[in-house]
């Protein structure tokens, strides 16, 4: 029997995803037409022995989360529960705090995955890989190859090339350690809790010595990467399964468009029915496009490649949309143009207006390049990135919004370039 745990974080996390995370918890943001988390849940539900999926985070239970959970349970016919942490306990602290719920029913193994990654989720391959190593005490990290420079932004894994054992693990090293990076997807057996428990006890001893008033809470904050993997490396217990299939983090809003492209591409294999096709009297599409059935699109509009159109969106005559996500209820009036942008819920773009951003894609000439997490400002200037309109933004006719971030509920009256409009 298997279980899966998805770590969804909380409202203090995902700040780089603002202003989109103001309206909806980041894990529920739609990527390729469905909430980010749904891709994880679907991959888990396809495993034959999967009995339960647990979401762990510190969001207050809210209507959106509850609605998503009840819909997902019906769609995937699997038990899905949300366990709320009382505070941010770290990637290891959360699963240790809820260890009784994870272990109830006696699972042989369980997956732990971060919500903010997009991947093909090679979960069956990870299970086979663990069986090949034949040791029920072994734990598996999903790894992939990055280029030397970008590897410094991730957890780096030094492996034994013959056995795939993790010999050394360093989280975000200061100098180059290895080009194999941690993908944030793990396969554990219940024995992992012994290792987390010993770190917890060690933390408690240190707290007692320090005589801190909030020592109990601090002892429970445990990070899988720094506290557990670093200690387990080289002990014959930790292995890395390397994948060459697509994988990316979804940290910034710009990376959501890139993740959307990867998932839309995957739909050819997994969900061809989700991809729009050119039909007589329908909108013209180029490349991979997702259109929600409730969207109203003029047949003279041209969409794609890499576009997803949400519920109740209205798109007028002669509109051009490319490399963008258009969210619920937005209106794109006649002859407007949207490139490399995310248009927020219920926003309106006037006639002949142009909303354009700069793509933050990985270097296409480097097969191992990952998406860069650019800082918001460089040399005192806003780094060019995709344009984001928060919810309920009104763009008047015939203006240009370029490389800008517009916070919710703004009525603009002129063009803007390289600005954050508060």
UniProtKB/Swiss-Prot annotation:
GDP-alpha-D-mannose binds at residues 85, 249. Disruption phenotype: Morpholino knockdown of both gmppaa and gmppab results in muscle damage and shortened motor neurons. GO terms for cellular component: cytoplasm. Residues 358-386 are annotated as: C-loop. GO terms for molecular function: GTP binding; mannose-1-phosphate guanylyltransferase (GTP) activity. InterPro entries: GMPPB_C, Hexapep_transf_CS, Mannose-1P_guanyltransferase, NTP_transferase_dom, Nucleotide-diphossugar_trans. Gene3D superfamilies: Hexapeptide repeat proteins, Spore Coat Polysaccharide Biosynthesis Protein SpsA, Chain A. Pathway: Nucleotide-sugar biosynthesis; GDP-alpha-D-mannose biosynthesis; GDP-alpha-D-mannose from alpha-D-mannose 1-phosphate (GTP route): step 1/1. Keywords: GTP-binding, Nucleotide-binding, Nucleotidyltransferase, Transferase. PROSITE patterns: HEXAPEP_TRANSFERASES. The N-terminal substrate-binding domain adopts a Rossman-like fold and has a binding pocket for GTP or GDP-alpha-D-mannose. The C-terminal domain consists of a series of tandem hexapeptide repeats that adopt a beta-helix conformation. The beta-helix forms several protein interaction surfaces involved in assembly of the GMPPA-GMPPB mannose-1-phosphate guanylyltransferase complex. A loop extending from the C-terminal domain (C-loop) is involved in interaction with other subunits of the GMPPA-GMPPB complex and may be involved in allosteric inhibition of gmppb catalytic activity by gmppa. This is Mannose-1-phosphate guanylyltransferase regulatory subunit alpha-A. It comes from Danio rerio (Zebrafish). The gene is gmppaa.
């Amino acid at each position: 029997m298997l279980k899966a745990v998805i770590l969804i974080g909380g409202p203090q996390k995902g700040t780089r995803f603002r202003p989109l995370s103001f309206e909806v918890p980041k894990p529920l943001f739609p990527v390729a037409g469905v909430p980010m988390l749904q891709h994880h849940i679907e991959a888990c539900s396809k495993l034959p022995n999967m009995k339960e999926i647990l979401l762990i985070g510190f969001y207050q239970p809210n209507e959106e989360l509850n609605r998503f959970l009840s819909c997902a349970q019906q769609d995937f016919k699997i038990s899905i529960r949300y366990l709320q942490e009382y505070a941010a306990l770290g990637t290891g602290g959360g699963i240790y705090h809820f260890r009784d719920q994870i272990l109830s029913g006696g699972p042989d193994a369980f997956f732990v995955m971060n919500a903010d990654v997009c991947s093909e989720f090679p979960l069956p391959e990870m299970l086979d890989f663990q069986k090949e190593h034949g040791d029920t005490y072994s734990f598996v990290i999903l790894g992939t190859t990055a280029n030397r420079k970008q590897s410094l932004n991730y957890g780096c894994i030094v492996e034994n090339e013959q056995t795939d054992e993790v010999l050394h693990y360093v989280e975000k090293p200061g100098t180059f350690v290895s080009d194999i990076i941690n993908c944030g997807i793990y396969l554990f057996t219940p024995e992992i809790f012994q290792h987390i428990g010993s770190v917890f006890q060690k933390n408690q001893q240190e707290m007692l010595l320090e005589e801190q008033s909030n020592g109990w809470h601090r002892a429970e904050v445990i990070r899988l990467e720094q506290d557990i993997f670093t200690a387990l490396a080289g002990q014959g217990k930790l292995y890395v399964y390397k994948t060459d299939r697509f994988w990316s983090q979804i940290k910034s809003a710009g990376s959501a468009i890139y993740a959307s492209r990867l998932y839309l591409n995957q739909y050819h294999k997994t969900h061809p029915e989700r991809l729009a096709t050119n039909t007589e009297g329908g909108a013209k599409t180029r490349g991979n496009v997702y259109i929600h059935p409730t969207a109203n699109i003029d047949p003279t509009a041209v969409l794609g490649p890499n576009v997803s159109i949400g519920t109740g969106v209205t798109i007028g005559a002669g509109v051009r949309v490319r490399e963008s996500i258009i969210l619920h209820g937005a209106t794109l009036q006649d002859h407007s143009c949207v490139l490399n942008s995310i248009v927020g819920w219920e926003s309106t773009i006037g006639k002949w207006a142009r909303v354009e951003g700069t793509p933050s894609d990985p270097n296409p000439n480097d097969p191992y390049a990952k998406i860069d997490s650019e800082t918001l400002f460089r040399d005192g200037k806003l780094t060019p990135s995709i344009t984001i309109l928060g919810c309920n933004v009104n763009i008047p006719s015939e203006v240009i919004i370029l490389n800008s971030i517009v916070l919710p509920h703004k009525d603009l009256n002129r063009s803007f370039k390289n600005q954050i409009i508060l």
